[in-house]
Design a protein with these regions (language model features):
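Glycine-rich segments within core transmembrane alpha-helices of 12-TM secondary carriers
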Residues: 135-153
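Conserved MFS/SLC helix-loop-helix module at the cytosolic interface between two early adjacent transmembrane helices
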Residues: 61-99
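Intracellular juxtamembrane helix-capping segments at the cytosolic ends
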Residues: 37, 115-129
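Residue-level signature of mid-helix packing/kink "hotspots" within the transmembrane helices
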Residues: 28, 56-64, 149-150
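Pair of pore-lining "gating" transmembrane helices in MFS-fold secondary transporters
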Residues: 7-29
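Extracellular/periplasmic helix-loop-helix junction of adjacent transmembrane segments
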Residues: 32-60
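Hydrophobic core of transmembrane alpha-helices in multi-pass small-molecule transporters
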Residues: 101-116
Length: 153
């Protein structure tokens, strides 16, 4: 959807920035829980680290899938689907009692991040921005991701 006005601050920019802040804020906090989880469950540090690496694989695998499906079904539906995967993975991970379960759920979380992360949001904001403000809008969303990581950590 193309916006015809030259306004930099648009509802799409604000919503996209908020989604990125939340997505990367939560993701940025995972490292804080490594030692408490390690101590509570007696997991090796490598098992927790592997789970986060698997999360990145889920993100990488999911990004082109969400991108392709976004073209077919629309951005809004795919962001909702991504958020659903993200939330389901987060909620179920609170019940994970083995490293393998945690790693599988981190894949689901990563897949959800693909639907709510930079690839989807930057594409949406870029399409909705005027030619005059597109680069600034994309920069604002990217900065929102960094702010989310700082807030989450």
């Amino acid at each position: 959807m193309k916006i015809n006005n030259n306004s930099l601050i648009t509802p799409v920019l604000l919503a996209g920035s908020l989604i990125i802040i939340i997505t990367f804020g939560i993701r940025g906090s995972f490292g804080i829980f490594q030692i408490p989880i390690e101590n509570e469950f007696q997991w090796l540090r490598i098992e927790f680290s592997l789970a986060l690496a698997i999360q990145n694989l889920g993100w990488g695998i999911g990004a082109p899938i969400f991108g392709a499906l976004g073209e077919k079904f629309g951005d809004r539906k795919l962001i909702i689907a991504g958020a659903f995967c993200y939330v389901i993975g987060l909620v179920l991970s609170t019940f994970a009692e083995s490293p393998l379960t945690h790693q599988i759920l981190e894949f689901i979380i990563g897949f959800g991040i693909a639907g709510t992360g930079m690839g989807m949001i930057l594409a949406i904001v870029g399409r909705a921005s005027s030619d005059k403000n597109r680069l600034m809008a994309l920069g604002i969303v990217t900065a929102a991701g960094s702010a989310g990581q700082m807030i989450g950590a």
